[in-house]
């Protein structure tokens, strides 16, 4: 098994840090400090070496230290392709983020070719009751760990959808170009939907077979494109293309694309109770979310033979002893680079004795 892990992390003008340099090993790392000391900021910085906007989904303008025009994050990282230096930097004046791999610029959605990450934060505990956009993004992040090209597909789909909306809004009379865009969207949609369904199938198998202290979940996706694939619809790309053509006038009026894989919802049920997770108690929702993360870790390692970096923000808060003990044993068994934030070591003293402690 190959581990993805950081050797070092350097922050400049990032959030509350003017300068911070950490040297770390391929071991569990515990960031300990009072609330507001910057523990979650460090996790967020690491998460920016994965497709997307990090574990907070923050606007780039918010991550620079107050009164500074730029910020940067550097990491020496054992990647899928070996030891490499990654840099991501942002300038307020240009409102651009630049990411580099060994001093060569790469697109944000290419990061999954090099890294693999999973995270769990308190903000995610409301994912079942929030809008479907957040749940869909959560599902796609899971897929990134199993198919590195999925992030690029999602990025391309969003680009072509934006182009289609622009052509419709500006009443550009170019049916041929619009047809080409819709055909590209349809082809990419098919790949995205298949990737999601395939991942959910294997995730469900993993959940069913994994015995732990957390409730089992039933996973599904509510989406027209995904359902057509499940129903065995033939010529799915042509069907999607035809639907996009049919909705042109409607989409022109409302100013957005009303049909497609960007409308799908990731649904999660409490298996034993047979109710949607959003109807469960907050404690049950957190437990179900942890169960999904555990299944993702198991499936990722089994399928790809790669252990991702795991970022856990205050994950032990409000867990009973049995579940806390299970998690510490599970993480020890996985032998991966795990980052945990906490305000104290109470109840995890044994686990802490095997970890690298960083006090903030």
Swiss-Prot record:
Annotated signal sequence range: none
PROSITE patterns cross-referenced by the UniProt entry: RECF_2
Principal location listed in the UniProt entry: cytoplasm
Annotated binding of ATP, by residue: 33-40
Domain of life according to the entry: Bacteria
Example GO biological process: DNA synthesis involved in DNA repair
Keywords carried by this UniProt record: ATP-binding, Cytoplasm, DNA damage, DNA repair, DNA replication, DNA-binding, Nucleotide-binding, SOS response
Localization per Swiss-Prot or TrEMBL: Cytoplasm
UniProt entry tagged with the keyword Cytoplasm: yes
GO cellular-component term (any): cytoplasm
Coiled coil region boundaries: none
GO molecular function: ATP binding; single-stranded DNA binding
Any Pfam family matching the protein: SMC_N
NCBIfam families from the UniProt entry: recf
Family: Belongs to the RecF family.
General function of this protein: The RecF protein is involved in DNA metabolism; it is required for DNA replication and normal SOS inducibility. RecF binds preferentially to single-stranded, linear DNA. It also seems to bind ATP.
The protein's name in its UniProt record: DNA replication and repair protein RecF
Biological source species: Rickettsia canadensis (strain McKiel)
Biological classification of the source: Bacteria, Pseudomonadati, Pseudomonadota, Alphaproteobacteria, Rickettsiales
Gene from which the chain derives: recF
